[in-house]
């Protein structure tokens, strides 16, 4: 039985019996990873086939998790396993993505003041990022599947080398992690720099605004993310 899956914004996906079929829709930044590299991670669904047009995974039945104290240890351990794997992922492309989104925003006339106001700060953050760690790069909770015994990380199409602080900040920000859970998460991860993490929290909210204002339809509501940038910049300067 073939059933279309509506979740996900780039590719066209279907469940076919016990498999997950994804028809690839390429942009300049996705599907660059060699998916075979992921085969040794027990938190990645089994890869069945992959070619230029489509990729097929084992279908995992489960739910999108709420990241909290009940599962943060398992999630952290998996992130550490990935970051310490020494796998050679594609070259980081965050700088190119930001440039592309900014130009697209001009074309769509969807810009807002905060994007220009903090452009120099963002460029400086990008210039100083480390690129030595293999990253998933899109660890929204909706790219996780929670089962009875495991949390799977899925949708690896944007995976590249990069700065571990980006991955940490990305999960904290996109999951709206509360302060107690964040402290446990960072204590468990342990090997991080709090200043670099703060810079990457600013960057994550910036790129989320860019994405919303270039990849979704108007009206745009990015006030929440704009305020988070302002709050984090205030912390940066205090």
Swiss-Prot record:
Entry's SUPFAM superfamilies?
Answer: Protein kinase-like (PK-like)
The superkingdom of the source organism is: Bacteria
Listed Pfam families: APH
Q: Which residues form a coiled coil?
A: none
Cross-referenced InterPro entries = Aminoglycoside_PTrfase, CcrZ_PhaseVar_Mediator, Kinase-like_dom_sf
Which family is this sequence assigned to? Belongs to the peptidase S49 family.
Quote the protein name from its UniProt record.
Protein LicA homolog
Which species is this record about? Answer: Mycoplasma capricolum subsp. capricolum (strain California kid / ATCC 27343 / NCTC 10154)
Q: What is the lineage of its organism?
A: Bacteria, Bacillati, Mycoplasmatota, Mollicutes, Mycoplasmataceae
């Amino acid at each position: 039985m073939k059933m279309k899956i509506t979740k996900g914004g780039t590719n066209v996906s279907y469940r076919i019996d016990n498999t997950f079929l994804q028809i690839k829709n390429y942009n300049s930044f996705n599907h660059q990873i060699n998916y075979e590299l992921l085969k040794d991670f027990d938190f990645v669904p089994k890869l069945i086939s992959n070619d230029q047009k489509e990729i097929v995974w084992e279908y995992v039945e489960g739910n999108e998790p709420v990241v909290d104290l009940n599962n943060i240890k398992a999630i952290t351990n998996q992130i550490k396993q990935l970051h310490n794997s020494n796998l050679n992922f594609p070259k980081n492309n965050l700088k190119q993505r930001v440039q592309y989104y900014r130009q697209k925003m001009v074309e769509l006339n969807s810009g807002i003041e905060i994007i220009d106001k903090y452009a120099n700060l963002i460029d400086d953050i990008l210039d100083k990022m480390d690129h030595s760690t293999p990253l998933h790069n899109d660890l929204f909770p909706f790219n996780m599947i929670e089962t009875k015994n495991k949390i799977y990380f899925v949708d690896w199409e944007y995976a590249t080398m990069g700065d571990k602080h980006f991955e940490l900040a990305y999960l904290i920000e996109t999951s709206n992690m509360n302060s107690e859970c964040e402290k446990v998460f960072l204590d468990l991860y342990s090997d991080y720099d709090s200043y670099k993490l703060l810079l990457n929290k600013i960057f994550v909210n910036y790129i989320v605004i860019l994405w919303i204002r270039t990849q979704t339809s108007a009206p745009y509501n990015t006030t929440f993310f704009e305020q988070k940038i302002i709050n984090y910049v205030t912390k940066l300067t205090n």
